[in-house]
Amino acid sequence: MQRQGIHGNILGENILKAGGMAMLMFTQVQQPSSLEEAHALMIKQKMAPVLAGGCWTRLGNRKWPMVIDLSGLGLRYIEEDDVEFRIGAMATQRDVEVYEPFQTFANGAFPKAVKDILGVQFRNMATMGGSVAARFGFSDIIPLLLALQAEVRLFEGGRMSVEAYLSYGKRDLLIEIIVPKQDVPVAIEALRKSTSDFPYLTGSVRRDDSGYSVYIGCRPGKPIRAVTACDILNEKGIDALEEAAEAIEGDVTFQSNSHASAEYRLSMAKNMFKRLVKEVDTWK
């Protein structure tokens, strides 16, 4: 079923009063009833934003001619089997935060990753799919998914790693996030000026049979792997931690913005790198 021609000034105000957030204005809303229909709309209406939780779309004063609402596609779920978790694109950050198996999986990394994202009211609305699809550099969630070697499932692109998705150029429908059940040490960290602020630096680390993989995000760009630093650590071991941390300067590009300068981010990234590596080394 597809609805057209609903006046967004009325519907939008009702939605946003319930959420207590900024105004979202649109002229028309499309509510596809199938994945096929949703994807076709995304391809046809290239300028129409996809409305998941709507927490970012509503920022600013723009009035959208059309939005595509995914709430009728049945994508709000968290499932698991013996080998993986599957997080539907419309599952909220709060759903992930309180999901019982995530309290212990990866040493509680999922609740830790989302607990400082604004307030509970926001996390009740912000979706996991929207958080990943937006590919914001300041994301708390993406560094964790990289460390967990998570994948996404797309309507057209199929399954691909989150790392590959960060560079995926097509407009495609994100259906779910897939997290393998691997018992490997991971750690995450996000640095903020205040509890409710956006982070000015994020990081994550994974240690498995192939060695260490450390990702630095909010540079303020998207998270990337500190390749040279990890190579030094994997070749020389933990005794070369200081040398590896210094290699971040040539590995990762930082920029300045209103949250932090490039120089400050670099300094903090070196210290974060050392803390993250030491944390996974304490895992038994």
Describe every region a protein language model picked out.
Residues 2-284:
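C-terminal structural segment of proteins
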